[in-house]
């Protein structure tokens, strides 16, 4: 029996699929939808070559999206790298490059930050 986060959350989704899993403001996501959304992202990560021990940055505010992306990373056996929203470009680049991140999830409000100097191995996943 696997006791990793993704397996536990999948089991919960199987048992109580229609119960609320995530609540952020007015947005409510059921366990079934939580598992479905994170599975779709996990599939995209796998297809892009991320797998066990791959790292992906989460440059997101506290939100349902953060938890969905985090679970997707867990589903492929990867390691989520939390990125402080207060980081300036230089700190962001340092963290993501030195953590060996292969992907970055970010909210649109952070899209103005330049990623031109960022050298991720899988740069299509920024």
Residue ranges and their predicted role:
Residues 87-114:
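Conserved ATP-dependent adenylate/AMP-binding module captured primarily in the ANL superfamily
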Residues 18-71, 88-93, 97:
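Conserved AMP-binding/adenylate-forming core of the ANL superfamily
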Residues 117-126:
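Single conserved hydrophobic/aromatic residue that forms the stacking wall/gate
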Residues 1-20:
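A short N-terminal helical cap/helix-turn-helix that marks the beginning
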Residues 77:
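Structured binding elements
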Residues 74:
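Anion (oxyanion) recognition and catalysis
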């Amino acid at each position: 029996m696997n006791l990793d986060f993704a397996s536990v959350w999948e089991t919960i989704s199987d048992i109580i699929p229609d119960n609320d899993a995530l609540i952020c403001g007015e947005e409510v996501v059921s366990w079934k939808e939580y598992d479905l959304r994170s599975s779709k992202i996990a599939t995209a990560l796998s297809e892009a070559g991320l797998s066990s021990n791959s790292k992906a940055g989460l440059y997101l505010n506290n939100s349902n999206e953060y938890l969905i992306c985090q679970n997707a990373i867990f589903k492929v056996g990867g390691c989520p790298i939390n990125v402080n929203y207060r980081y300036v470009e230089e700190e962001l680049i340092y963290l993501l490059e030195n953590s060996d991140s292969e992907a970055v999830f970010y909210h649109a409000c952070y899209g103005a930050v330049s990623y031109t100097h960022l050298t991720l191995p899988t740069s299509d996943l920024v």
